[in-house]
């Protein structure tokens, strides 16, 4: 989602609260609970869940491994739920031609650097750059090249929905709005 006027361009970023993250966090949580229940059932010698007959599974080594996978899955699931709760990666990009300032804001993990706020003058922007990697896992990333700072990504590296035409159009619109050149690598 973005908002544009003659002098200001604001682009809101979704972050980690995506449908896919909710799906995988739920699947991982339920699957790891199943593994943990089977491991606990094999330790106790009776079925905790009637759907999962685990009396044939010996506690050592299968039950131990199932319990380990269950605990590991719960930790990974907790990590996913925390990133969703904290909305890591969300924020906005604001380009203000009137003031000549570009502001990039992102939410991170809790701590000292939870809020990532970058501010640049427009005259320090050298170009808008598109990095294209084709192949089995294609990537198209939009960067803003800043004098003395290097390249700053404007799109997430896991956004695979961009077709070459979409990323090129977005880069061209942004380069036109900022009145700077566009490069493709």
From Swiss-Prot:
The chain crosses the membrane at residues 21-43, 63-85. HAMAP family: Ycf4. It holds the Pfam family Ycf4. It is a multi-pass membrane protein. GO terms for cellular component: chloroplast thylakoid membrane; photosystem I; plastid. Keywords: Chloroplast, Membrane, Photosynthesis, Plastid, Thylakoid, Transmembrane, Transmembrane helix. Its main location: plastid. It comes from the Eukaryota. This is Photosystem I assembly protein Ycf4. Seems to be required for the assembly of the photosystem I complex. It is found in: Plastid, Chloroplast thylakoid membrane. InterPro entries: PSI_Ycf4_assembly (IPR003359). The gene is ycf4.
């Amino acid at each position: 989602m973005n908002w544009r006027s003659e002098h200001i361009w604001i682009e809101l970023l979704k972050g980690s609260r995506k449908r896919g993250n909710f799906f995988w966090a739920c699947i991982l949580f339920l699957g790891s609970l199943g593994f943990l229940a089977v491991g606990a059932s094999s330790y106790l010698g009776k079925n905790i869940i009637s759907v999962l007959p685990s009396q044939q599974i010996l506690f050592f080594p299968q039950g131990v491994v199932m319990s380990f996978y269950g605990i590991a899955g719960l930790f990974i699931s907790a990590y996913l739920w925390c990133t969703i709760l904290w909305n890591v990666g969300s924020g906005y990009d604001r380009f203000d031609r009137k003031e000549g300032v570009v502001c990039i804001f992102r939410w991170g993990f809790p701590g000292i650097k939870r809020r990532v706020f970058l501010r640049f003058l427009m005259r320090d922007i050298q170009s808008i750059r598109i990095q294209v990697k084709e192949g089995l896992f294609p990537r198209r990333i939009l960067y803003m090249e800043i004098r003395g700072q290097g390249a700053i990504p404007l799109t997430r590296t896991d956004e695979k929905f961009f077709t070459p035409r979409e990323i090129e159009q977005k880069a061209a619109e942004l380069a036109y709005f900022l009145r700077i050149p566009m490069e493709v690598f």
